[in-house]
A protein has these predicted regions:
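N-terminal "domain-start" segment that seeds a small globular fold
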Residues: 19-42
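Thiol/disulfide oxidoreductase modules built on the thioredoxin-like
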Residues: 99-104, 109-155
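Cleavable N-terminal signal peptides
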Residues: 9-10, 20
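N-terminal signal peptide c-region/cleavage motif recognized by signal peptidases
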Residues: 15-17
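Short active-site neighborhood of thiol/selenol oxidoreductases, capturing the structured segment around
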Residues: 42-60
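Bacterial N-terminal signal peptides that target proteins for export
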Residues: 1-9
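Short loop/turn microsegments at loop-to-beta-strand junctions
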Residues: 28, 50, 125-126
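Structural microenvironment flanking redox-active thiols in thiol-disulfide oxidoreductases
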Residues: 63-101, 112-117
Length: 163
């Protein structure tokens, strides 16, 4: 029996995304050790908005959005955040990078071969999730974001929930 190359390629294209990318859970969990040795537990942030931001030191759009993202999180009492350094590099390199580009939210290094189970594998960086106070994903962003994007997503989620 002959199997055409096009047929095999077509089958791979249909199957590969299901194998590589998982769905993000409706109410994801996340418990990671931050670079400063503390534990960040998303479940402990219920009642607040949480910005979960996948980034990397080599990602120019990630670096460009960091100051505005940091200022947004620092300015809002109802918002916290976590930066997930999604790269295969030495932990100290990330710490050194952050020494020159500090942020006002904790950072954890994520193993690219074993990322958090409740979040889909990022298809690009930066990837940002806005988690609502009830723990649900209010919005997922692929690419750089601005403060206005987060504010708009928060307003949309609030109006959808009747708050």
């Amino acid at each position: 029996m002959k199997i055409s190359l096009a047929g095999l390629l077509g089958m791979f294209v249909l199957v590969a995304p299901a194998c590589v990318l998982a769905e993000t859970a409706a109410k994801p969990t996340l418990k990671v050790e931050t670079l400063d040795g503390k534990t960040f537990d998303l479940a402990e942030k219920r009642g607040q908005w949480v910005v979960v931001n996948y980034w990397a030191t080599w990602c120019a759009p990630c670096i460009a959005e960091m100051p505005e993202l940091s200022a947004f999180i620092k300015a809002r009492k109802d918002v916290s955040g976590i930066g997930l350094a999604y790269e295969d590099t030495d932990r100290q390199e990330i710490i050194d990078f952050l020494a020159t580009r500090p942020v006002d939210y904790p950072i954890a290094q994520i193993d690219v071969d074993d990322p958090p189970a409740d979040f889909a594998t990022p298809r690009g960086l930066p990837t940002t999730y806005l988690i609502a106070p009830d723990g649900s994903v209010a919005k997922q962003f692929l690419g750089p974001i601005k403060e206005k994007d987060l504010e708009q997503a928060m307003a949309t989620a609030k109006s959808a929930s009747g708050n």
